[in-house]
Regions:
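Glycine-rich phosphate-binding loops of nucleotide-dependent enzymes
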Residues: 2-241
Length: 241
């Protein structure tokens, strides 16, 4: 089963932000989505999750058509995402914050709290159940955001710069967490990040965007050595060297 974006085109005020981009994310795989600033990475995730309309193309998950669906409908179809800037309910406890996400996917109150406890324990936040989410460190807020995304038991999870702003210790802990998700939960994981060492460690396959178009995709080593990718990041001189 795969999450599939086919020929996705997005325009803003007549300017083409994505130009016929296609990718497939199978369950059980970690796919890295990379590219220079402004290449369209977040726009593609927004298009997949119903945040922005498509000018052309289609989105499907496990054969279920998602084109034109609202963000809530996409989430209920078990496609979850996180954001570059985390979204938190600072006035709720950590447990309540995650349980609220489970409630939004149809769980009852008792089941939602049980699900939240399970996820928080898994993410090393068990002792923080009753703390206000707003008082957590930046790294722990990231963990809570991922826990909230997992509360609906997604088949596909899209992470937008999940390690941005983290120190090395927190980043390493998050890496271990993300690496385990496809095996432990059978989900497909797409990661956007500018940290190439993180991407190369986590992702077996890469998809590269530049100026809204796909310029390379495939095995991480082959993509890293692709002249078009080197040029996009470092300029033509570096690619020709």
């Amino acid at each position: 089963m795969s999450l599939v974006a086919s020929e996705v085109t997005v325009e803003f005020a007549g300017l083409r932000a994505l130009d016929r981009v296609s990718l497939a994310l199978p369950q059980g795989e970690i796919l890295g989505l990379i590219g220079p600033n402004g290449s369209g990475k977040t726009t593609l995730v927004n298009a997949i999750t119903g945040q922005v309309p498509l000018r052309h193309g289609r989105i499907a998950a496990g054969g279920v058509e998602l084109t034109g669906r609202s963000p809530r409908e996409v989430a209920l179809a078990r496609v979850a995402r996180t954001f570059q800037v985390g979204r938190h309910f600072d006035h709720l406890t950590v447990l309540e914050s995650v349980a609220t996400a489970a409630l939004g996917h149809g769980a009852g109150v008792v089941a939602a709290k049980a699900r939240a406890r399970e996820l928080l324990d898994e993410f090393g936040l068990g002792p923080r159940h009753d703390d206000l989410a707003g008082g957590l460190s930046f790294g722990d807020k990231r963990r809570v955001e991922v826990a909230r995304a997992l509360a609906g038991d997604p088949q596909f999870l899209l992470l937008d710069e999940p390690a941005a702003g983290m120190n090395d210790v927190v980043t390493e802990a998050l890496l271990e967490l993300f690496a385990a998700l496809p095996g432990s939960r059978g989900l497909g994981l797409l990661i956007i990040d500018h940290d190439m060492s993180l991407i190369m460690r986590l992702c077996g396959r890469l998809h590269v965007l530049a100026s809204g178009r796909t310029i390379a995709e495939g095995d991480r080593q082959a993509v890293r050595d692709d002249p078009a990718v080197i040029e996009a990041y470092l300029g033509r001189e570096a690619a020709d060297a």
